[in-house]
């Protein structure tokens, strides 16, 4: 498993304006992660993304 910022098609992390932890948690769990939250960036950060399920890349820092 890996942790990181899941990215959209434009290689930018998913924004979570308003620090919406529920949005990020759902987004991450939909990607089969253990959980997720909104960090100060503000972007969604996921914990426990399975390597074999995650098709798109993740970033370890930064929005784009």
UniProtKB/Swiss-Prot annotation:
UniProt KW Nucleotide-binding keyword: no
Tissue spec: Expressed by the venom gland.
Compartments, record wording: Secreted
GO cellular component: extracellular region
Broad class of the protein's primary localization: secreted
PROSITE patterns xrefs: LCN_CSAB
Keywords: Disulfide bond, Ion channel impairing toxin, Neurotoxin, Secreted, Toxin, Voltage-gated sodium channel impairing toxin
BP GO annotations: defense response
S-S bridge residues: 12-64, 16-38, 24-44, 28-46
LCN-type CS-alpha/beta domain ranges (all copies): 2-64
The organism's place on the tree of life at top rank: Eukaryota
Keyword Secreted attributed: yes
GO MF annotation terms: sodium channel inhibitor activity; toxin activity
InterPro entries for the chain: LCN-type_CS_alpha_beta_dom (IPR044062), Scorpion_toxin-like (IPR003614), Scorpion_toxin-like_sf (IPR036574), Scorpion_toxinL (IPR018218), Scorpion_toxinL/defensin (IPR002061)
Domain commentary: Has the structural arrangement of an alpha-helix connected to antiparallel beta-sheets by disulfide bonds (CS-alpha/beta).
Entry function: Alpha toxins bind voltage-independently at site-3 of sodium channels (Nav) and inhibit the inactivation of the activated channels, thereby blocking neuronal transmission. By extending the depolarized period it indirectly affects beta-cell voltage-dependent potassium channels, thus increasing potassium permeability.
UniProt record similarity statement: Belongs to the long (4 C-C) scorpion toxin superfamily. Sodium channel inhibitor family. Alpha subfamily.
Protein name: Alpha-toxin Ts5
């Amino acid at each position: 498993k890996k942790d990181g910022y899941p990215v959209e098609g434009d290689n930018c992390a998913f924004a979570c304006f308003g620090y919406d932890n529920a949005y990020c948690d759902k987004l991450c769990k939909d990607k089969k992660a253990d959980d997720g939250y909104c960090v100060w960036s503000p972007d969604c950060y996921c914990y426990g993304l399975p390597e074999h399920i995650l098709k798109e890349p993740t970033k370890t820092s930064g929005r784009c």
